């Protein structure tokens, strides 16, 4: 399958590598708004690049991994230039119908993972959630996803919105809490690395226990002495509010 990559960020860097490794596809080109990004990914994938939408070459499938705001502006021009192609976006929070009225064949290819350009991942372990505008296209998208992942799921736009919301809680907010922890430790000269065994064990536990059953800490028993003492140690008002709200939420839901 001839594939054009629209975008050259964290997700596309990892997906591009996975598609190339699958040996069943030809990455015909990388497009990005910035030459530096397009050139860097194209070099990794040994394929041409462009920054001009009018110069995007013919492909069977175009996979779009760009900011949500950019997606809506790219679709009209890209679909007009390549009316017979299949178009897939990779956004967890965008509806499939963003293509409606522009493309004949379209769908969603959403790999749910946190990606960084310089951090290798095993793409076969990453769940990919797919959707398409008809059954024939859905079969193509499923087969494409199966070449890079062992966990392919069909999900509607409505379901995917909630999946993405859950991912924000499980990943983005959790990582922000790591950052807050690092900011607490730094003035005391304590390296963040001491937290890693705790973080790893917390993640391991939910492989065997539900998150509800795995919850520990002063908020479980609502130990107000500890909670109030720790809140008083926090200088930043926003961080203090986060501590208070999370403690209350833990207590209320147990």
PLM segments and residue spans:
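NAD(P)+-binding Rossmann beta1-loop-alpha1 motif at the extreme N-terminus of oxidoreductases
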Residues: 1-51
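Internal alpha-helical scaffold of NAD(P)-dependent oxidoreductase catalytic cores
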Residues: 37-44, 120-162, 170-207
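Interdomain hinge/lid region at the active-site interface
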Residues: 186, 200-254
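Short, well-ordered alpha-helices that flank and scaffold nucleotide-derived cofactor binding pockets
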Residues: 13, 17-21, 43, 76, ...
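Rossmann-like NAD(P)(H) cofactor-binding subdomain of soluble oxidoreductases
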Residues: 35-40, 44-120
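Short active-site oxyanion
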Residues: 1, 26-29, 59-62, 83-87, ...
């Amino acid at each position: 399958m001839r594939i054009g990559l629209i975008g050259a960020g964290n997700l596309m860097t990892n997906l591009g590598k996975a598609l190339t490794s699958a040996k069943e596809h030809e990455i015909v080109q990388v497009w990005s708004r910035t030459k530096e990004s397009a050139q860097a990914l194209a070099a990794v994938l040994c394929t041409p690049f462009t920054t001009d939408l009018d110069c995007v070459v013919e492909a069977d499938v175009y996979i779009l991994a760009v900011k949500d705001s950019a997606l809506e502006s790219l679709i009209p021009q890209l679909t007009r230039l390549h009316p017979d192609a299949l178009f897939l976006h990779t956004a967890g929070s965008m509806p499939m119908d963003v293509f409606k009225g522009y493309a004949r064949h379209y769908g969603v290819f959403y790999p749910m993972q946190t990606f960084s350009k310089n951090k290798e991942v095993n793409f076969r372990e990453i769940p990919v959630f797919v959707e398409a505008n008809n059954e024939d296209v859905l079969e193509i998208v499923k087969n494409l996803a199966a070449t890079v992942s062992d966990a392919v799921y069909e999900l509607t736009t409505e379901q995917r919105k909630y999946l993405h919301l859950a991912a924000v809680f499980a990943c983005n907010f959790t990582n922000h809490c790591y950052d807050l922890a690092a900011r607490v430790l730094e003035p005391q000269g304590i390296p963040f690395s001491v937290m890693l065994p705790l973080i790893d064990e917390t993640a391991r536990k939910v492989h065997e226990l539900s998150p509800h059953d795995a919850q520990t800490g002063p908020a479980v028993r609502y130990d107000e002495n500890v909670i109030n003492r720790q809140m008083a140690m926090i200088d930043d008002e926003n961080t203090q509010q986060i501590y208070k709200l999370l403690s209350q939420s833990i207590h209320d839901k147990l």
